Amino acid sequence: MERLKRMSVFAKVVEFGSFTAAARQLQMSVSSISQTVSKLEDELQVKLLNRSTRSIGLTEAGRIYYQGCRRMLHEVQDVHEQLYAFNNTPIGTLRIGCSSTMAQNVLAGLTAKMLKEYPGLSVNLVTGIPAPDLIADGLDVVIRVGALQDSSLFSRRLGAMPMVVCAAKSYLTQYGIPEKPADLSSHSWLEYSVRPDNEFELIAPEGISTRLIPQGRFVTNDPMTLVRWLTAGAGIAYVPLMWVINEINRGELEILLPRYQSDPRPVYALYTEKDKLPLKVQVVINSLTDYFVEVGKLFQEMHGRGKEK
């Protein structure tokens, strides 16, 4: 048990990057943290950390030991969580990886509600473009939008994210409303340069498909910048509904070409274990599944309102 405590202290030092930060997190003194690491090094007869007055770094032996510590500590935590699961109460830290837009537009609000419902649960939300790596980043679950490529991982489809062509009402007042896909070529286009969202198809009610690869003077790989351009009236864009759902509800943006359909992006949860899915992971999967059902209904309502205009 004492060795497990020392391993936990060492792992915290590595993860927080300093003895001081680890001491603050563990509510221990800095000297106690330092002594614990020194005892580990004496016991193992290897140097785990390179220390300087400004920073610490892992030695090669320290890197190997840290990886082992992390695996063992996760296993201990999982055992405790499985026992608590008998009471249908998820506990522990849920480590989720996703894109920054998924975090900002979906998971921030969703996890806030989850933690109110489950006081024994905490969340570590890791973001990035592309989404963080499930194995390398030590995550419980990764949420991905679009086609999957990780054949070694287990996955579950959570739903689909509708895609919309939209623009600010101020832009449409000045430049007019496009009635068909061909009209988009005469408008200012806001281009999201990350594939596959920079090319798409629109399908007419009679089944005729039009493939579009529009280019514009405004190009970015940052979703937030694209939305800012949209609301500023800089042009028209093709984006996931979750990026602009609040702006549409507030009346700042309007969905265009409502008679035309576009394939939604599939959304998946990726994880490593098929049969022993921790309760905390199951909870977030269920919550996201419910979310995308509601988003689908909302999209149909929005499209219906657009067709009536």
From Swiss-Prot:
Query: What InterPro entries does the record point to?
Result: LysR_subst-bd, Tscrpt_reg_HTH_LysR, WH-like_DNA-bd_sf, WH_DNA-bd_sf
Q: What is the regulation of this protein's activity?
A: Activity is regulated by p-hydroxybenzoic acid.
Its GO biological process annotations read: DNA-templated transcription; DNA-templated transcription initiation; positive regulation of DNA-templated transcription; regulation of DNA-templated transcription
* Keywords carried by this UniProt record: Activator, DNA-binding, Transcription, Transcription regulation
Similarity comment text for this entry: Belongs to the LysR transcriptional regulatory family.
Q: Where is the HTH lysR-type domain?
A: 1-59
> One MF term in GO for this entry?
DNA-binding transcription factor activity
Q: Where are the transmembrane segments?
A: none
Functional summary from the UniProt entry: Transcriptional regulator that activates expression of the aaeXAB operon, which is involved in the efflux of aromatic carboxylic acids such as p-hydroxybenzoic acid (pHBA). In the presence of the effector pHBA, acts by binding to a single target within the aaeXAB-aaeR intergenic region. In the absence of pHBA, binds more than 50 sites along the E.coli K12 genome, including genes related to biofilm formation and several genes involved in stress response, suggesting that it might play a role in quorum sensing in the absence of pHBA.
Native organism: Escherichia coli (strain K12)
| Effects seen without this gene | The mutant is hypersensitive to p-hydroxybenzoic acid.
Which residues fall under the DNA-binding region feature? 19-38
Name of the molecule in the record: HTH-type transcriptional activator AaeR
List the CDD domains hit by this protein, alphabetically. Answer: PBP2_CrgA_like
Keyword Zinc part of the UniProt annotation: no
